[in-house]
Regions:
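Acidic, glycine-rich A-domain
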Residues: 2-228
């Protein structure tokens, strides 16, 4: 596994992070997002993203910027598939399109900020390392039902490979957990995410997602049948 074979979007983003801004790379990343989302429906509800861009997301060595690049890739993917989306950065500095990892990981405060806007769902996108007030996210998550807050909150783990050990990277184990390490997992992650939304927006997304997937499978079958 390398930094650049976990999907085209994150591969371009890794190069941007490691080599500095390039108009050509930025355009290639944008095109990769468009191609990856072309056949997906749009979720019409309100989505809040708590995006971890704290210092720990930089990592080091061969994995430098890898988890962060995959998190940003997922964010750009979501931005194309969500009609109403708001991002709450945890740490980070510089360009909002390509934030540099910096600062502490205070996921709890960002979650509270996100919930104030009453979204249909909150996705916490993080590498799982909580280095500010450890345990606060778990306490906040556990207290939400007592505060009559029933907004679905899902923890989305950004990984380097499918074999990453997450045992020490679950700051709120009671939250529903989704994992991703490759761009190919994004569509199913969206399906899992929005299936937790109550109401018509979630139902509509699931229905359109499955219909588009069925149509794609039928087209693939027709091509295969014609060539055999």
């Amino acid at each position: 596994m390398t930094a650049t074979n976990r999907g085209e979007i994150s591969a371009h983003l890794v190069h941007l992070y490691r080599g500095g801004y390039s108009q050509q790379l930025q355009e290639a990343a944008d095109l990769a997002v468009l191609e990856a989302t072309a056949m997906l429906p749009v979720f019409t509800g309100k989505v809040a993203i708590v995006l971890d861009v704290s210092a720990s997301t930089r990592s080091y060595g061969d994995r430098e910027f890898c988890s962060l690049s995959q998190s940003i890739a997922l964010l750009r993917f979501l931005e194309k598939c969500c009609q109403h989306i708001k991002v709450y950065n945890v740490g980070g500095s510089g360009n909002s399109e390509l934030p540099m990892p910096e600062g502490d990981t205070d996921l709890a405060t960002a979650l509270l900020d996100a919930l104030e806007d009453v979204p249909d769902i909150v996705a916490i996108v993080s590498d799982g390392y909580e280095n500010t007030y450890p345990g606060d996210l778990a306490k906040i998550a556990a207290s939400l039902p007592q505060l009559d807050i029933h907004t679905p909150v899902v923890f989305c783990h950004s990984k380097f490979t499918n074999l990453d050990d997450l045992r020490m990277r679950r700051p709120a184990s009671e939250l529903p957990q989704l994992e991703f390490w490759h761009q190919n997992e994004f569509p199913d992650l969206l399906l899992s995410l929005f299936s937790r939304v109550t109401g018509t927006s979630g139902e509509q997304f699931i229905r359109e997602f499955l219909l588009k997937k069925l149509k794609s499978m039928e087209q693939e079958l027709m091509v295969w049948t014609a060539s055999n």
